[in-house]
């Protein structure tokens, strides 16, 4: 029998399925040493984990190439782009393109396109870290796609 796949928003998924995804991420990132530990940390039974583990995947896990384009409005200070790229690299993103405008009135715009295939954290976590940088006035996702 051929299996059909559906793209479903997270907010309509049963809680058990969300927790299975969490348990799988804990195992993948080596935050749990065993299925039993991952299930316990995710607050599900091992039975639930085994029932759904091969049935639910994060969207980015089944795509070939996930590219996100980020827009930044930065204060013009020495080393800001380097520091920003360091945070992006630490998240496991591969920078594909960089476009920086000439600074005007102490501000510059930067657009980055990054591959998120090898990210070691969620995109929301990366955005939160980038927003915490003192020279970042604005950061937003302006595009994303699967290629």
Curated annotation (Swiss-Prot):
> Which InterPro entries does the record cross-reference, listed alphabetically?
ACT-like_dom_sf, ACT_dom, UPF0735_ACT_dom-cont
Superkingdom of the source species: Bacteria
UniProt domain ACT: residue ranges: 69-144
Q: Which family does it belong to?
A: Belongs to the UPF0735 family.
Protein name as annotated: UPF0735 ACT domain-containing protein GK2605
Source organism of the structure:
Geobacillus kaustophilus (strain HTA426)
List the taxonomic lineage.
Answer: Bacteria, Bacillati, Bacillota, Bacilli, Bacillales
């Amino acid at each position: 029998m051929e299996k059909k796949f559906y793209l479903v928003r997270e907010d309509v998924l049963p809680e058990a399925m969300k927790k299975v995804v969490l348990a799988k991420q804990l195992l993948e990132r080596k935050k749990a040493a065993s299925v039993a530990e991952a299930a316990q940390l995710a607050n599900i039974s091992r039975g639930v984990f085994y029932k759904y583990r091969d049935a639910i995947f994060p969207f980015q896990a089944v795509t070939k190439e996930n590219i996100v384009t980020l827009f930044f409005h930065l204060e013009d200070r020495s080393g800001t782009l380097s520091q920003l790229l360091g945070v992006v690299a630490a998240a496991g993103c591969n920078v594909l393109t960089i476009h920086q405008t000439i600074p005007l009135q102490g501000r510059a715009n930067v657009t980055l396109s990054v591959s998120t295939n090898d990210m070691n954290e969620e995109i929301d976590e990366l955005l939160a870290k980038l927003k915490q940088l003192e020279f970042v006035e604005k950061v937003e996702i302006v595009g994303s796609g699967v290629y």
